[in-house]
Amino acid sequence: MPRTIAKPSTISEGINRRFLEAIEAIVSLGKVSALEAFCTLYDLSAPRYREMRLTYGVSPKPGYQSRYKNIEVEAIYSLVVNYPISSRWLITGRGKMLIE
């Protein structure tokens, strides 16, 4: 039986993109040194998020489709609890990314 590959919803794609945008922001703010460091700190799979960055990142690789379709809940939790990132912005795209 062929494997069915589900296409992520536009909601999931938006959250994926905003998550990776937020990671870039905390790196540029000096809160964490790189995506890999964030993953190490919170026991996440760096290869997973590097691959997702090729599809959903700030500068995606044209035509590349990640095997991973969604950001893990643990990654979202770690981002909004430990950094000045708005959970409302991350989930809905409304408001500002950074919390003052």
Regions found by a protein language model. Give the residues of each.
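DNA major-groove recognition helix of helix-turn-helix/homeodomain DNA-binding modules
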Residues: 65-89
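Short amphipathic helical patch at the helix-1/turn junction of helix-turn-helix
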Residues: 28-29, 54, 70, 81
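Short, charged recognition helix plus adjacent turn
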Residues: 1-10, 81, 87-100
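Helix N-cap/coil-helix junction residues
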Residues: 31-32, 44, 58, 85
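DNA-binding alpha-helical recognition surfaces that contact promoter or target DNA
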Residues: 21, 51, 92
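Recognition helix of helix-turn-helix/homeodomain-like DNA-binding domains
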Residues: 40-71
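A short, Lys/Arg-rich alpha-helix, primarily the initiator
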Residues: 1-41
